[in-house]
Design a protein with these regions (language model features):
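Structured, solvent-exposed acidic/aromatic patches
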Residues: 1-28, 137-174, 187-200
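An aromatic- and glycine-enriched ligand-binding surface/loop that stacks and positions planar moieties
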Residues: 1-118
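Acidic, mature catalytic/reactive cores of soluble proteins
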Residues: 62, 66-68, 150, 187, ...
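Amphipathic alpha-helical assembly segments
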Residues: 89-159
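Short alpha-helical basic/polar micro-motif
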Residues: 173, 179-180
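A long, glycine-enriched binding/interface module in the latter
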Residues: 193-234
Length: 234
């Protein structure tokens, strides 16, 4: 982070950060689920398009899994049998056109989708591309989509309905600065000054940072859902 608008845990200060409200999909209106602090309070105003989901090399680029929340655990006070709290309750399948594994875009308790650790079906599965589908309509619903997790704020002190976030707002990131420099090199190359490869010293460091490292756990990542009051944005 190069520049941020800083907020404080002092609730008597003027103004708080409400940015966390707008990027999260609805989950609390689904059976087996209820609103909680880590899931945030979903106003669901901003959802990525399919291009944004598909631009990543999902196998090797850690940024996808560290940017989008694709699973929710069952958290209802009295979940219906055979489910218990902590079971996988919601899963978004971010697949590609041509995938023939799924018969529908919405699969509820489908025997075709089993969560291996528990041997149970998953109550709610939302698939981007069902078998035979090539158009981007799998999540054609303003409520259901993998949530951008970068702005989640678990540091809110008044509970899960609190709208007043405490995390800083990032105004300028180092990665964006690198990409602006790379774009400048590309534009110069188009004008005949320099080469396109001059952009690589600015692009490759970002690729190196984003790739999964040796022995890095792919199932563990940080998002703001469990953030302490002083949690930085990364």
């Amino acid at each position: 982070v190069i520049l941020s608008a800083q907020f404080t845990a002092d609730l008597t200060a003027t103004g708080q950060n409400t940015q966390h409200l707008y990027f999260v999909s609805r989950y609390e209106d689904i059976p087996q689920m209820q609103r909680d602090l880590s899931g945030d309070r979903p106003f669901s105003r901003m959802a990525p398009n399919f291009y944004m989901y598909r631009i990543y090399d999902i196998q090797n680029d850690s940024r996808f899994w560290k940017t989008f929340r694709t699973k929710h655990k069952v958290n209802a006070n009295a979940p219906s049998a055979p489910y218990v709290k902590g079971d996988l309750g919601i899963m978004y399948v971010v697949n590609q056109p041509g995938d023939t594994r799924f018969s529908a875009n919405v699969l509820n308790n489908s025997p075709s989708v089993i969560y291996t650790p528990t041997g149970k079906t998953i109550p709610h599965v939302y698939v981007a591309y069902k078998s035979g589908q090539t158009t981007d309509i799998g999540w054609n619903d303003t409520r259901r989509y993998p949530s951008l997790s970068k702005f989640m704020d678990g540091s809110r002190t008044a509970g899960f309905n609190d709208v007043d976030g405490l995390r800083d707002i990032t105004l300028a990131r180092s990665a964006e600065t690198y990409l602006i420099a790379a774009e400048a090199k590309v534009r110069l190359a188009k004008l005949g000054t320099g080469a396109y490869t001059d952009a690589l010293p600015y692009i490759n460091p970002l690729r190196a940072r984003a790739e999964y490292k040796n022995a890095e756990s792919r199932s563990v990542y940080y998002d703001g859902g469990g953030a302490p009051s002083s949690a930085p944005q990364t």
